[in-house]
Amino acid sequence: MPGARELTLRVERGALFRRRWAASAASSARAAILRDPRRCALGTRPRWVSFLVIVLVIMNVVTAHPKYPNDPLALVLIELRHPRTEPPVPSAISILKEELARWTPILEQEEVRQVNLETGEHTAHSQKKLVARDRRTAITFRPDAMTLEVTDYPGWEEFRSIVHAMVTARQDVAPVDGCIRIGLRYINEIRASLAEPSGWAYWVAESLLGPGTQLADLKLTTTAQRHVIQCEGPEPGDSLTLRYAGARGAVIQSTPFLQRLKEPPAEGDFFLIDIDSAWSDPCKGIPALDAHLVDEVAERLHTPIGPLFESLITSELRTKVLQQPGQE
């Protein structure tokens, strides 16, 4: 019978092999979807094995990308949409605050302005918000949804535990009638030097960059770009939306209630990789909202996010930027 050290070495070698295999499979899947994004348009049924199926299969052996020292994550959020209801009364808010005090002990009131697109009428209302002392975690109970937002991502296990506590507390104190949609979103702003002649192609997959060479041959200069790819997931009701673009400034802005971990340069270049993984009932029903449902669905929605991100960046970005604390 092998000793403990030999067993450890076998496990490590097996894990290394699986990581390499998964990275290769994810890269092939990413290349396939970006060669012909129409095959994954929402509402169509691809005749080949879908990109998301491949990613979700390889996730049996690969977990999400690590939290890098110089992490590009600007915001991670989950939104649990439910039938519109009255906001929790003050006494219920006090209990929610107490139940979630480990993460968000501060009660704030946010003024929200909305515009009616049909009439042009402006309306304003206030909503309660629970925030962390460092203002990098916020929980909001809106009339039609509850959300958790973090700008200093603690990792999936801790994030998931906050989600579980949020849902449990809300349903114990001021329950909502059901679940319409669950959305999990990771917004990355990649910042790196563009001194290399290849520009962003040095840092991200070249297939993300569009027909730059062809445009340059016609003496056309790209001034803005934004791409959206929508995919059906392997499970009924699952979908994934990938948004990516080169841009300047920032997508995520600090607010009085939610501060960015690092304030970006006002006019700095960045590359956006925004992954939005979502579920809604495939039969158009409204199932009961409880922590068990959210745990199960959120785990499944989270599954492809890390491998997809890792397949869209280069090893140069990983080693020269993301793994270097304090560098941009």
Regions flagged by a language model, labelled:
Residues 55-143, 147, 289, 322-328:
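N-terminal low-complexity, intrinsically disordered segments
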Residues 57-58, 65, 125-131, 181-264:
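Aromatic/basic-lined ligand-recognition segments
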Residues 72-79, 137-153, 179-187, 268-282:
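Glycine-rich, often proline-containing surface loops adjacent to acidic residues and nearby aromatics
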Residues 155-157, 161-180:
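Secondary-structure boundary elements
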Residues 268-328:
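Long, compositionally biased interface segments
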